[in-house]
Amino acid sequence: MGAMLMCMLHTQAHSNVWKYVDENGVTHFTNQPPGKDAQLVIRSDTSALPVTPLIEPQGSPDAAAHRTVAIMHASPAYQAVQSSLTAASVSHGVDYELLKAVVAAESAFNPNAVSHKGAVGLMQLMPATARRYGVQSEPGSSISSKLTDPEINISAGTRYLADLLRLFGGKTELAVAAYNAGEGAVMRAGNRIPNYKETQAYVKKVMAVYRVLQIR
């Protein structure tokens, strides 16, 4: 299935590609819009870098994570932003492997990814969140357009993740949950992972990839 998707992404280079998560928390990519909750990850009018698919077919989450990491490390899209990820990791004190796992889950390393909610870029930042970290609009350049710049996106996203790690006492799973659902949702859940299917699947996915990256 992973090979079939890679073929689709290359042969559909000038078509839109959507990402969606089914009721079992499995991520899929398709060239047909599957519904309102789908996330557009490749636009037909952009020359986006190849994406790293986060497909989790039948099998354990750890097996899927190993597969994801292998594809990621061979991806030109990942290789293009390695230096930016390294710099942000050092500057803001966030584990480099955790950053990689979050970006893989958020955008599959597509800098032009845009969600139906308006989150943009590699780390899928909302413009309001990016504004908190110094990203400002300028004449002819909106915050959303600036967030397609990998360095700007990674810098702001890493600072946000660093703040979440501090807020939740270095508990990685809670910080990851807050990155997906918002810090308020984690606090309302009593500083636990909220009982949202999407968030719970997201945390499992990020942590599985993170564990694999830590031992490689």
Predicted regions and their residues:
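Short, cationic interaction patches enriched in Lys/Arg with P/S/T/G and frequent prolines
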Residues: 5-80
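Catalytic glycan-binding domains that act on GlcNAc-containing polysaccharides
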Residues: 61-216
